[in-house]
Amino acid sequence: MSRNTPHIFTSESVGEGHPDKVADYISDSILDACLAQDKTSRVACETLVKSNMVIIAGELTTKAVIDPEKIARQAIREIGYCNRQDDDVFHADTVFFTNLLTEQSPDIAQGVDAREAEGKGHAEQGAGDQGIMFGFATNETPELLPAPIVFAHKLLIELARRRKRGHVDWLRPDCKSQVAVAYDEDGRPAHIENVVISTQHTEDVDHDTIYSYCVKLIKNVLPAELLDERTEYFINPTGKFVVGGPHGDSGLTGRKIIVDTYGGMGRHGGGAFSGKDPSKVDRSAAYMCRWVAKHIVAAGLADKCELQVAYAIGYPAPVSIRVDTFGTGKVEEISIENALENIFSFKPADMVEQLNLLRPIYRKTTHYGHFTNPELPWEQLDETRLASLKQLLH
């Protein structure tokens, strides 16, 4: 990942109205509704959207009394698919809704629950599944995230802000962005090679208007020092994008895991986030790994850091932990790994406590990456832990 020669790295983002993100948002909205009433809720909610249909399926164990259909329609309305003229197929008020949620398997529950069970051997909360999770951080941006994914997200955040404020009346919810960043010999962002924006629009706007509007937006949002006459702009390259969202393509929870994380620059264990409560280490451990990697970089122990953990279902402690600083470390990686054991805990119950995860905060994660919102707990640095890590430099 760390390279000594100039190179280009590209990442993409997708907007709130992208069909996969519509599905993610419905799943996270149902999760939050459960946690708002019952913080011990076990939720694994998958959503499929296509044409004028919404189907939810998965496992749900909760004392909360919720109306999944009402929640789904409200989520769709918040995204913006509620215009009678333009949303004649996929509309918040008229979609057909199917609920296939069932209760969590008791075999899975006994492994996760903080109680003894035959063959379990302990009474601690165990991991909800086996698997590997990664966290990543780099000091190339203030967010401690890779520049390409940060830039791609920022473009769509601004596009959505303008759409929702009525800046222009032709913008619609479905959109995508892509940014190619050239890195210099030191591995720092040096130039933006090209930018792609594809945005859904109404029928009554011409391509030239969309092109000039989006190029101006790009120049307002991205760092001016990285843009010049060599930068290429690809705006709605197909020429027309009227049919979008679930009307144009099917959407499914968990299909934008690279957009949700590091834009491809950091590894991904394969487990999606949306619709899963914190007992699922796919979500909680990935957040924890991001939090720890961010502390390692913020403490000055490395310019770039990736953390991997692995779990066995039903067991509380990770079966392995690995730190990789890609040759940018100021101290030995084994020293960092040893220090982590005393500063952080990767047991499922401890991760939930350290990050205060049993709250309805997950709708805030769905859009524009799970690691871009400074209000979220895994994006906030703990000064005591930071100071402990800095001791390794002395």
Curated annotation (Swiss-Prot):
Mg(2+) binds at residue 20. Catalyzes the formation of S-adenosylmethionine (AdoMet) from methionine and ATP. The overall synthetic reaction is composed of two sequential steps, AdoMet formation and the subsequent tripolyphosphate hydrolysis which occurs prior to release of AdoMet from the enzyme. Its main location: cytoplasm. Signal peptide: none annotated. It comes from Akkermansia muciniphila (strain ATCC BAA-835 / DSM 22959 / JCM 33894 / BCRC 81048 / CCUG 64013 / CIP 107961 / Muc). It comes from the Bacteria. Homotetramer; dimer of dimers. Binds 2 divalent ions per subunit. It holds the Pfam family S-AdoMet_synt_C. Belongs to the AdoMet synthase family. Gene3D superfamilies: 3.30.300.10. NCBIfam families: metK (TIGR01034). Residues 104-114 are annotated as: Flexible loop. ATP binds at residues 18, 174-176, 240-241, 249, 255-256, 272, 276. This is S-adenosylmethionine synthase. Its cofactor is Mg(2+); K(+). It is an enzyme of class 2 (transferase). The gene is metK. It is found in: Cytoplasm. K(+) binds at residue 46. L-methionine binds at residues 59, 104, 249, 280.
